[in-house]
Design a protein with these regions (language model features):
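N-terminal alpha/beta PP-like core and its mobile active-site loop of ThDP/TPP-dependent enzymes
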Residues: 1-236, 240
């Protein structure tokens, strides 16, 4: 990823923090996505550098944390040959990453030409932040890194939502009305969207108990009468029945 690293050094608008290991870099980017409102970005090198980042990416995927991974890659011709033939390796440390990381990312793309970088960057960012958030990954061959981008590039067109907020709300309220014993499971998404206050206000009006996941543990205080407990393998003392 030497040309990406060189470009990062020459850009005074970006702050780069060097980690001793790619796993630490990926986990740091994950943490940035959790506490901020934008994806943390992780830049890693080819082959083992990319595979070292996978644990941090999987962590971000499972916990719905927005994260952006950019990896260096072998020459685009070498990568294309590997993808076409299925050969395990041709270039030095070259590795076709898509089969390995597609199941733990919301979007993955190998950027095979410089004129497509705007499209992939915009689509990746949209994918990381839209709906249930998560990590995205762009793999950039070394020859593409060192080429000039054209002034005019095709961007990504944001798709229209299939359902409006009012339609989604109506559907949720309809199901809630049919429920005999409603229970709210509040997770990390409630905190990430800044909706904890609105959720608790709604549950209080409707007298609906709340159980939290590990990621949503701070959505509701443990002394709140609506708090039932913590789900998954962690056990907490529930409140008294109302």
């Amino acid at each position: 990823a030497m040309w990406l690293t060189d470009a990062l050094k020459r850009n005074d608008r970006l702050n780069a923090y060097c980690c001793h290991h790619e796993q630490a870099a990926a986990m740091s980017a994950d943490c940035c996505g959790r506490v901020g409102d934008v994806p943390g970005v992780c830049l890693v090198t080819i082959g083992p550098g990319a595979t070292n980042a996978i644990t941090g990416v999987a962590e971000a995927y499972l916990d719905s944390s927005p994260m952006f991974v950019i990896s260096g890659q072998a020459n685009s011709k070498i990568l294309q040959y590997q993808m076409d033939t299925g050969i395990r390796q041709k270039g030095t440390q070259s590795l076709d990453l898509e089969p390995m990381v597609s199941s733990i990312t919301k979007y993955f793309a190998a950027v095979m030409s410089p004129d497509s970088i705007r499209f992939h960057m915009e689509k990746a960012y949209y994918s990381a932040m839209e709906g249930r958030r998560g990590p995205v990954w762009l793999d950039v061959p070394i020859d593409v890194q060192n080429r000039q981008v054209p002034e005019q590039m095709k961007g990504f067109d944001i798709p229209e939502d299939k359902k409006t907020d009012s339609e989604i709300s109506s559907e949720a309220l309809e199901r809630l009305a049919k429920s005999e014993k409603p229970l709210v499971l509040a997770g990390f998404g409630v905190r990430a969207s800044g909706s904890a206050g609105k959720l608790l206000e709604f549950c209080d009006k409707q007298n609906i108990p709340v159980v939290t996941s590990r990621g949503g543990i701070d959505v509701i205080t443990t002394d709140n009468p609506l708090f039932v407990g913590l789900s998954l393998i962690h056990i907490s003392e529930p409140t008294r029945p109302r």
